[in-house]
């Protein structure tokens, strides 16, 4: 799978960089060892941050700024990385979905990135292009119904949108039958920190999802 960044994104967010991770995986409904790791990190996170101070985390702040430059209100349509962090800081447990989604969420809260997670077999075509959502562009967010993505960064495959920082699309979402994972770490703050987050993602998918044939794709 190739990833291209449109001119409109490069103009709005010139520092943007990303890393995609592709791998063969085995998903499971729940992993106790992973959730022990998540719970331990959540305790530490609540000691380090408040709902006010997370605005100063570089990755979260940069994603919010990217929304504003593209034409979206990040307080009304929160990027997922920020939304997950706010959730745990309000004392609400993270959603327990399945092992792949849960470990992606752990990487997201640890580093502050909004991360897309996809079933690669559900993509149409061989290229994803990162652009900006248009008025009335159809997009069904996972568990959200039709989502207004106008002015929002969006990855599109051959037939339409598959992922935004706020929500991925129902059409390409991960499931228990997923065997080919494709995940994208979105660095609106630039390259710094991306590789560390990607390496942690690889560590988790190898430990908890039996990942094989892991490939990292850097793009900007």
Please place each PLM-identified region on the residue numbering.
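Charge-biased, low-complexity intrinsically disordered regions
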Residues: 1-220
């Amino acid at each position: 799978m190739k990833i291209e960044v449109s001119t409109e994104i490069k103009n709005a967010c010139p520092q943007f960089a990303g890393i995609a991770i592709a791998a063969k995986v085995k998903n499971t409904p729940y992993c106790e060892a992973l959730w022990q790791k998540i719970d331990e990190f959540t305790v530490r996170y609540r000691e380090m941050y408040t709902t006010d101070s997370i605005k100063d985390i570089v990755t979260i702040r940069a994603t919010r700024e990217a929304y504003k430059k593209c034409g979206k209100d990040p307080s009304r349509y929160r990027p997922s990385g920020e939304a997950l962090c706010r959730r745990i800081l309000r004392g609400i447990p993270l959603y327990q979905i399945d092992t792949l989604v849960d470990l992606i969420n752990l990487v997201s809260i640890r580093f502050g990135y909004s991360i897309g997670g996809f079933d690669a077999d559900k993509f149409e075509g061989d290229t994803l292009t990162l652009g900006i959502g248009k008025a009335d562009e159809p997009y069904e967010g996972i568990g959200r119904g039709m989502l207004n993505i106008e002015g929002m960064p969006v990855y599109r495959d051959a037939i339409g949108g598959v992922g935004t920082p706020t929500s991925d699309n129902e059409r390409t979402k991960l499931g228990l039958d997923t065997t080919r994972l494709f995940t994208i770490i979105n660095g609106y703050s630039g390259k710094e920190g991306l590789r560390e987050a990607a390496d942690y993602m690889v560590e988790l998918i190898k430990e908890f999802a039996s990942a094989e044939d892991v490939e990292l794709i850097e793009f900007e």
